[in-house]
Amino acid sequence: MLNILEINDFAAPELDIYARRTEAQLINKDNPEAGLFIAESPKVIGRALYAGYIPVSALVEKHQMKENEETRQILERFEGIDVPIFTAEFEVLTKLTGFKLTRGMLCALKRQPLMDYQNMCEGKDRIVILENVMNPTNVGAIFRSAAALNMDAVFLTPGCSDPLYRRASRVSMGTVFQIPWTFIQDNNEMRCQREILWPRQAITELRE
């Protein structure tokens, strides 16, 4: 049975994730194990769930919950796991979040620990490096292209936008959950390790 809760109090603390906390705050750098992110649209949420990310709660437009088959299929995956599903009309959700929801659905999920880039290199031949790509839309578009080109992994320098930011994951159409990725300290670190890690492999650098 689904745990559906109609929104009747904008000040409810459980809605802070969607209404009052920034994405940077959700990362929770002081306690990464408690970090969260927001996925938008049934397609993106479905790919996050398939990749093993654990849902914390969902925010769904009433009409979409009744009429959208893709939304209903995602909600079926919440059966029996007691994930709160907050629901309201479109106008209420727009007022709460400050933007129009794509396909009327958001989901808060737990972040997974990032892999060490050296371990991630093993067995991978085609690796994309993003250097200081700060726009989440561009990060998402690059991930989508990387998926289309069958790239094996994506590495990002600290100046890049987080691939799990809502806009990045939405523009990527959920491919951020399909391609292994991690952050590296800087490109110099990668270059100095290149001969050790990939003596016969090419690195592609993409810049804004």
Can you say where each PLM-predicted feature lies in the sequence?
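A generic structural signal for short beta-strands and their flanking turns/coil linkers
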Residues: 54, 103, 175-177
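RNA substrate-binding interface of SAM-dependent RNA methyltransferases
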Residues: 50, 77-80, 86-87, 91, ...
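Boundary-proximal intrinsically disordered activation/regulatory segments immediately upstream
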Residues: 1-73, 160-161
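Glycine-rich phosphate-binding loops that contact phosphosugars or nucleotide phosphates
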Residues: 107
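Short connector loops at helix/strand junctions that flank enzyme active sites
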Residues: 53, 100-102, 123
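Phosphate/diphosphate ligand-binding glycine-rich loop within oxidoreductases
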Residues: 67-101
